């Protein structure tokens, strides 16, 4: 059921952008750091995917995560790895339902978004 097709609209008639608060910035910073570590190590990005509970610890909410996925800033998958496997394994999903073993990575679009959001917060602070 999708009844929430309406968006908030500002006085100019433009769709209002969501507030990028400190919790979202902290989550983006953690996801971006994992992305950079994977690149630096020459590893598969998914080997550095972050478990959702670590993202919740930054103050991210389930709505934040759903928004990141819906905007295609983040990808997610259910981890199906076994102890001792040389690499982590995931069952990828595009949906907005997450299970306890869901992990997240930034997409290329998300890396760009995170860089801008974090740069803006540094310039403002």
Residue ranges and their predicted role:
Residues 82-90, 103-105:
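Minor-groove-contacting beta-hairpin "wing" of winged helix-turn-helix DNA-binding domains
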Residues 124-125:
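Short, intrinsically disordered terminal segments enriched in charged and Pro/Gly residues
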Residues 2-70, 77-78, 93-102, 114-121:
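Short amphipathic alpha-helical interface segments
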Residues 75-76, 86:
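Long, charge-rich, low-complexity alpha-helical segments
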């Amino acid at each position: 059921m999708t009844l929430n097709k309406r968006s908030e609209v500002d006085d100019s008639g433009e769709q209002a952008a969501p507030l990028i608060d400190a919790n979202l910035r902290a989550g983006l910073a953690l996801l971006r750091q994992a992305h950079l570590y994977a690149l630096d190590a020459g590893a598969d990005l998914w080997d550095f995917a972050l478990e959702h509970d670590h993202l919740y610890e930054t103050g991210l909410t389930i709505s934040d995560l759903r928004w990141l996925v819906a905007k295609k800033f983040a990808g997610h998958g259910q981890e199906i790895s076994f102890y001792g496997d040389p690499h982590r394994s995931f069952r990828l999903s595009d949906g907005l339902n997450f299970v306890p073993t869901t992990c997240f990575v930034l997409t290329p679009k998300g890396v760009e978004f995170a860089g801008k959001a974090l740069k803006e917060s540094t310039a403002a602070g």
